[in-house]
């Protein structure tokens, strides 16, 4: 045992070609010149424990861009997204082809008011409305044959005209609107002859206005006449109705 300890001691000492000394526990320092030499190297010690991990190194420089990879597989269809905001109005497109003809539409309402009447007898009373009882047209019944007056039911502009036969006497005829004479016609009878007299006028009427003809003056001015061959007529109709 003593021999084995001496051998181990010799192996632990530094070699003869390295001069060392110690300073503190576990620290070997070179020996000064002239120290003891000739010691043999010791046997290698056991490997030490792993040290603590070092800190992360600095980031490296970016590498070169790699080549484009192959397209990936088509993924599953996603959910429907929210409706986006309306886009800007696009440019005007080209004209389309002409469509088919549509069905006839309803026309605008037409206001109608008209009459045309004639005299059946030459017996008339002066200064009274002339009763024209021979009806040519009175579909809207705006002319009253019992009074000889036209009654306005649609406000607007009207045209009135009369054509009378004159025989045996002179005639004076006036057209009235609301008890006011608006137009006068006088014809002087020529003996042994049949005369014709006429008149026409445009009048604006309101609802409820009345228009008629009458002989004015005494009986000697009542030459209004009608028979199977000669007519005396009174006509009126609406040109256009008021829009306001």
From Swiss-Prot:
Q: Where is this site: Not hydroxylated?
A: 62, 86, 104
- Residue(s) carrying 5-hydroxylysine: 33, 65, 68, 77, 101
UniProt-annotated location(s): Secreted
Positions annotated as glycosylated: 21-22, 65, 68, 77, 101
Q: What is the effect of changing residue 164 to T?
A: In ADPOD; does not assemble into trimers resulting in impaired secretion from the cell
What is a single molecular function from GO for this protein? signaling receptor binding
Q: What is the effect of changing residue 101 to R?
A: Impaired formation of HMW multimers
Presence of keyword ATP-binding: no
Q: Per the record, which residues fall in region Disordered?
A: 40-101
Any notes on this protein's domains? Answer: The C1q domain is commonly called the globular domain.
**Description of how the protein assembles with itself and partners:** Homomultimer. Forms trimers, hexamers and 12- to 18-mers. The trimers (low molecular weight complexes / LMW) are assembled via non-covalent interactions of the collagen-like domains in a triple helix and hydrophobic interactions within the globular C1q domain. Several trimers can associate to form disulfide-linked hexamers (middle molecular weight complexes / MMW) and larger complexes (higher molecular weight / HMW). The HMW-complex assembly is also modulated by the degree of lysine hydroxylation and glycosylation.
In UniProt terms, what function does this protein have? Important adipokine involved in the control of fat metabolism and insulin sensitivity, with direct anti-diabetic, anti-atherogenic and anti-inflammatory activities. Stimulates AMPK phosphorylation and activation in the liver and the skeletal muscle, enhancing glucose utilization and fatty-acid combustion. Antagonizes TNF-alpha by negatively regulating its expression in various tissues such as liver and macrophages, and also by counteracting its effects. Inhibits endothelial NF-kappa-B signaling through a cAMP-dependent pathway.
The protein's name: Adiponectin
Q: What is the lineage of its organism?
A: Eukaryota, Metazoa, Chordata, Craniata, Vertebrata
Q: Which gene encodes it?
A: ADIPOQ
């Amino acid at each position: 045992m003593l021999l084995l300890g001496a051998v181990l001691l010799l192996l632990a000492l530094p070699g003869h070609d390295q001069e060392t000394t110690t300073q503190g526990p576990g620290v070997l320092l070179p020996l000064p010149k002239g120290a003891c030499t000739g010691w043999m190297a010791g046997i290698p010690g056991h490997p030490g424990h792993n040290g603590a991990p070092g800190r992360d190194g600095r980031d490296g420089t970016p590498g070169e861009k790699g080549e484009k990879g192959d397209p990936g597989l088509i993924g599953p269809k996603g959910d429907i997204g929210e409706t986006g905001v309306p886009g800007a109005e696009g440019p005007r497109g080209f004209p389309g082809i002409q469509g088919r003809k549509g069905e006839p539409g309803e026309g605008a309402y037409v206001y109608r008011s008209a009459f045309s009447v004639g005299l059946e007898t030459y017996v008339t009373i002066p200064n009274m409305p002339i009763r024209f009882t021979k009806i040519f047209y009175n579909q809207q019944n705006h002319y009253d044959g019992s009074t000889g007056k036209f009654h306005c039911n649609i406000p607007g502009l009207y045209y009135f005209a009369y054509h009378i036969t004159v025989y045996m006497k002179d005639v004076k005829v006036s057209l009235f609107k609301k008890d006011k004479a608006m137009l006068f016609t006088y014809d002087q009878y020529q003996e042994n002859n049949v005369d014709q007299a006429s008149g026409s006028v445009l009048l604006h009427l309101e609802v409820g206005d009345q228009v008629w003809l009458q002989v004015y003056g005494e009986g000697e001015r009542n030459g209004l006449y009608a028979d199977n061959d000669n007519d005396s007529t009174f006509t009126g109709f609406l040109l256009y109705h008021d829009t306001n």
